[in-house]
Amino acid sequence: MSALLVLSMSVNSVAYASSVSSPTGIEVSFSNAGIQENLDAAMQDFTGLSDKEICDLLVHKYGFSQSEVDLLYSVYSARASISTYSGFPSNPSIGQTYGWEVGPITLPTEQDAARIAVINAVAALAVPSFGAVAALITAIAANLPLGETVVITINYTYGYTNDGVLGWTPGYIGIRIV
């Protein structure tokens, strides 16, 4: 597993002050206020856009390089179903929760390398839409604790999705420095 994939998967869920529901298909909250503010703004920006329009916005508004955006989209497009990840209950019941934790991961000290690591990790998660992935990447990348060792946790709840299908839905996400 690449260091980039491991980094993004190392976000750990912690207590959250608020929750944000969005049309991008994901409801998350961060313990870090800066990340939460960036997520709220990015989710508004990406709502209703095509994947191509989101890619353009990531480059022109959020300062990602074209190669970072290409990497994000290719990893997102090739991601596995959440049910293929080890650790998730094999026979869950409705309402059951699972905290997927990866880490500890030491972030690179330079911003670009850390951003690429987060892109790989978050894009590989079973997040319901490219817009939601892009919003998460944008929110986290702007507030990375460079050079720190972190644990990332994503809490999932099993139940009916917005499409009326039973599945795991990502919820609270947090980055904890260890």
Model segments located where?
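Hydrophobic core
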Residues: L4-M9
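N-terminal propeptides/leader regions of secreted preproproteins
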Residues: N12-L107
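Hydrophobic alpha-helical transmembrane segments
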Residues: V133-I137
